[in-house]
Amino acid sequence: MVTLEKIELKNFKSFKKLSLDIPKGFTAIVGPNGSGKSNIVDAILFVLGKTSAKKLRANRFSGLITYHNGKRADFAEVCLYFTNENNAFNVNADKVGILRRIKSSGETDYYLVWKENDKEKRKKMTKHEIIDLFRRLGLLGDNVISQGDLLKIINISPIERRKIIDEISGIAEFDEKKKKAEEELKKARELIEMIDIRISEVENNLKKLKKEKEDAEKYIKLNEELKAAKYALILKKVSYLNVLLENIQNDIKNLEELKNEFLSKVREIDVEIENLKLRLNNIINELNEKGNEEVLELHKSIKELEVEIENDKKVLDSSINELKKVEVEIENKKKEIKETQKKIIENRDSIIEKEQQIKEIEEKIKNLNYEKERLKEAIAESESIIKHLKESEMEIADEIAKNQNELYRLKKELNDLDNLINRKNFEIEKNNEMIKKLKEELETVEDVDTKPLYLELENLNVEIEFSKRGIKELEEKKKELQAKLDELHAEYVKENARIKALKEMEELSMDRAIREILNANLPGIIDIVGNLGKTKIEYKTAIEVAAGNRLNHIVVKRMDDAVRAIKYLKERKLGRATFLPLDRIEGREAYYIDEDGVIGRAIDLVEFDEKYRRVFEYVFGNTVVVENIDIAKELAKKYRKVRFVTLDGDVIEPSGAMIGGTFKSKAKIKVDVDLSKLNKIADEIIAIESELRKIKEEIERLSKIVKRSSAKKMEIENTLEIIKKNEMRKREIAEKNTIKIKELELKNKDILEELEELNLKREEILNRINEIESKINELIERREKIINELKEYESDENLKRMNEIEGELKILEKEKAKLKNEIDKGLTLVKEILIPKIEELNKKVSELINKKVILEKNISFYKESIEKNLSILEEKRKRYEELAKNLKELTEKKEQLEKEIETLERERREILRKVRDIENRINELMVEKAKYESKLEEEERKLYLCEKVDVSKELEKKDIEELEIYIGELENEIKSLEPVNMRAIEDYNYVAERYKELIEKRKEYERDEKKYLQLMEELENKKKEVFMEVFNKVAKNFEEVYKEIGGIGKLSLENEKNPFEGGILIDASPRGKKLLSLDAMSGGEKSLTALAFLFAIQRLNPSPFYVLDEVDAALDVKNVSLIADMIKNASKDSQFIVISHREQMVSKADVVYGVYMENGLSKVVGIRL
């Protein structure tokens, strides 16, 4: 442990220069009031780091610099020198000083001072470094104890007293650790709170997505079921239509067989009727021979009518059926006419072009024939041979032309076929490109990753929730602070009014003469006494009574100044005033009285500049201030030369006169107005207003966050909704594209089948072309041989030219023939085929129309004829019956035959009717078959387009009607679910996974929370353990210390179970008295107990040195001796520097320093006892 060896002061307060050795043991410093002895204590505190000038009894730090002879020094410095035991200061020196220097600007600096090789070295230190150094040395200013500190210990609450033990026990370390744990706990709880918000948001999303996911799953399931049902329905329909077509085919086959049976039977009946008719004719011949002509004629006419009626009926039925066919044929022929007319227009355009070419060729032929006629005369021989060869050549040429025409036709057909094949291939390519494009569209339909959006939405909700909570908390805090601000404003107004009132009272206390002198600016005038000093509010009444009117006396520098002022008053008749010249005024020093109830000498209760000390000694003289009149009365008996004034203004004069009663203050002395409260209130107001501004700014910031995040949240939610709709649209596009692809693939399949047929046909045409080309080549060879023979006969020039002309003519004729042939073909096609075809078609249409008209007329005619003939038949039969009676037997035979014939004919007609019915039924079945074949083709197309799916047994059991009803129900149910968010399944799975992550994270945070709670509990237990250990030691020390001074002392906890929820109580029994609490003790007993408490703490953790400043002021003689012995004993372990006026204390010191004032500066003289 280091030792304080020396204190050095330069220009510090009342000391110009001082070097004070501090030996080990007990050092006392004595001196009269105002001598400056307490300035030594201030010097020590100054170095130990006091940051407030007021605590060093100065208005500002620059006020610590010595002021002498009207001039302030440039700086002040104080240095404390310590032994450097165990290299405590980390420098190579036996003695190290800690120096603090202050400049006139108020700025202070720290230095570490030591000697190295007899040279002084200084190292500048920061305040922080110095404080750390003092902390290591155990010197933090709490080893300096003043009478005020004793009062503080006496007056502090038990809680604050416990806090002293808290500090010395070092449990702040646990508090710091606990605070850190609390911060971590707070963080963990904030994280739990934050994650709860996230979980809540994710739960909400999960609930919303769950419904959408279930809908999507249901939608998928229903769509799959719908696909299966549709697939099953198509399969059922295909199967049903195949069975139906098979049944229809079987029905047609059976009907054809039945029709053939009926027709065979008709032929048999016809044979039988023919036989019966032969027999009937024989009978008729016999009747003719035997009967009259009329009967026979009637019979004949009847039979003819019957036959005619029957034939008319057949014709009528046939005409009706024919009419239907004619109507259909008319429509077909009209379509064919339109197509043929289109071909005629195309051929006519071609013919016109070729006719123009023929005209040009004919002009060339005409010119060549003219030349040929001239050459003919010269040519006589070889004509017959040439003619024969030419005829042969012409026949071959015609054959070649014929084959070439056929070849041209085939090549044209081949070209048309190739064009058709190319168109088909182009169509396939176009379809393939479309399929590729559609597939690319399907590939480009990418899913949008919504995970970041949901995560951002979650973060935004957390931000919004926390911001809202923050706003709510801030609003509450703002409300509380506003209420507190209102209270502080009211308190400020009240305190300010009080201070203002005090100042106004001070101004009103002056009479006119004093005010005039003070305002006259006369030389040497200083001020009135009351303005040169100030006291505390609690001493105001006592001081004003003690000083009386002397407080209004005017202080001047010299007597001449007083004379000048008096003349000034006389000349102006301003009244009277009392003047106190500093060069002549003398006062009396008051006695020191150490008794219970004594507050102090009146002069000591007033603060003033030392240069005015004689003025205040004159004003107060031997006046002592005591607590009350009873104490004054007792002390007046003992101290007869002392004037006693009580705190409430009662007076006992040395003469025995007593003055008392109600006193009305006139504010003659300045009160040491405590502006700290007002300043504190103002500081609090400023702090709260600043905090309110920050809160408002924070609320605005959080509100902006809420607004911005809410807008962003809405934007994300809208984005998710758009994504949802886009997903549906993409799915619809994908479904449409898939169907379209299959349709195009099916179309390509049909085209490929068609191309296969066209390619086969092309092969056939190519084969035929090859055959014709081979034949043409053969004919050309034969023709070339004939031409070579002709060349032999055409060797002369005329013949050669004739041959050339013939050749040219042949070529031209050939071209002309070819063109004519083409024209003829075109004309033939138009005239003989197309126009006749149109004419034929028109004729056919006309015929069909005429036929239709005729048929309609025939139908009308035959209906009328049948009705007319039936009427005539009826009449003839009546006549015949009358005539037939005579030829009964023959007639009966005849009638029998006729009946048989009629029966057979009726049977024949019935059979033929059945045949017609069968044919009609066959036609109906054929139509029905075509319809069902078309339906089957459509269903098979659908089956191809459909994706193959597994069909459940339940669907297989349903028939077509049940499936159609079921499909309708499924479609309605699917429609009711739309629109469906198909991403909901993926989003739900992501959010569910996120939910699990958050739950796990929450458990982790809960574990952290539990860990920090456990740590806090452990720290609290350890803190209590350490505190109790220190408290028990201090309590034991307190008992021992109190025992040493002849009494019984006890420290106890208000709350033994939880000491930090209560304070420390002090109970003591001073010598010869019962056990009392601190509140029940007298002032001296309280001081003694406070000192005992301080010594108990000192014994626990001794500091290198202690400074005690007039801590014995309130003690009686006996207790001062006890405390002095205690200090003497404690000084064996630590240095003690004691400021005291008490003889009992000073007499026990090892070294005594006396402080005195000389020419306004403090001096020190030392005595070793």
Swiss-Prot record:
Record's protein name: Chromosome partition protein Smc
PANTHER family linked: STRUCTURAL MAINTENANCE OF CHROMOSOMES PROTEIN 3
Entry note about domains: Contains large globular domains required for ATP hydrolysis at each terminus and a third globular domain forming a flexible SMC hinge near the middle of the molecule. These domains are separated by coiled-coil structures.
Protein family per UniProt: Belongs to the SMC family.
Binding sites annotated in the UniProt record for ATP: P32, N33, G34, S35, G36, K37, S38, N39
Top-level taxon in the UniProt lineage: Archaea
Subunit structure comment from the entry: Homodimer.
The gene coding this protein: smc
Residue ranges that the Swiss-Prot or TrEMBL entry lists as coiled coil: 166-507, 676-1030
UniProt keyword annotation of Nucleotide-binding present: yes
UniProt keyword list: ATP-binding, Coiled coil, Cytoplasm, DNA-binding, Nucleotide-binding
Species assigned in the record: Methanocaldococcus jannaschii (strain ATCC 43067 / DSM 2661 / JAL-1 / JCM 10045 / NBRC 100440)
Record-level GO BP terms: chromosome condensation; chromosome segregation; DNA replication; sister chromatid cohesion
